[in-house]
């Protein structure tokens, strides 16, 4: 069910209440868009790691996934590692939430270590050969572009990583040229 309440109004409602795990959990159980959004805004950060997998598995729409990634998932302990795990699940909204979480982490200035970067590149390569949804593919490519734009040398490492595995470039050359300017 979607009542069409605007995001700013939902945030205003949430701002009037203290963060509360029990209330957030109860709101999440209702299959109503506005309740799920309020649940995301009201869940205390220290409990976000406990509910992450469960809430992702129950998420059906990208709007909810976007807010879940932005407001909760990118704040859990070891968020980059968890995001890479979700990407590898390859079912439901897990890959989408994983890429969105990575995108928010990159925007906040985190840097992937060598192992994380390798896993990220592997996921991008696998995506070009998969049957994932267009929405997940677009999200993954946008995350890849954001990573390249914010991580010096990553474009070269991505090219090296993919040259022997995939004859098609993971991120088309015309997009990479735009990031170099």
Each model region followed by its residue ranges:
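Alpha-helical scaffold domains
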Residues: 1-181
């Amino acid at each position: 069910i979607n009542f069409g309440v605007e995001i700013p109004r939902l945030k205003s409602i949430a701002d009037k209440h203290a963060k509360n795990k029990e209330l957030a959990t109860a709101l999440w159980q209702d299959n109503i868009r506005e309740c799920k959004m309020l649940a995301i805004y009201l869940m205390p950060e220290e409990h976000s790691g406990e509910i992450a997998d469960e809430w992702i598995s129950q998420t059906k729409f990208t709007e909810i996934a976007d807010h879940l990634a932005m407001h909760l998932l990118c704040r859990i302990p070891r968020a980059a590692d968890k995001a890479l795990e979700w990407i590898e699940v390859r079912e439901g909204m897990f890959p989408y939430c994983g890429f969105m979480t990575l995108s928010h982490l990159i925007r906040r200035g985190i840097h992937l270590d060598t192992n994380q970067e390798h896993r990220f590149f592997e996921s991008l390569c696998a995506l070009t050969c998969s049957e994932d949804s267009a929405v997940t593919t677009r999200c993954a490519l946008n995350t890849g572009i954001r990573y390249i734009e914010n991580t010096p040398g990553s474009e070269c490492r991505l090219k090296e990583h993919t040259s022997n595995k995939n004859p098609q470039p993971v991120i088309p050359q015309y997009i990479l040229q735009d990031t170099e300017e």
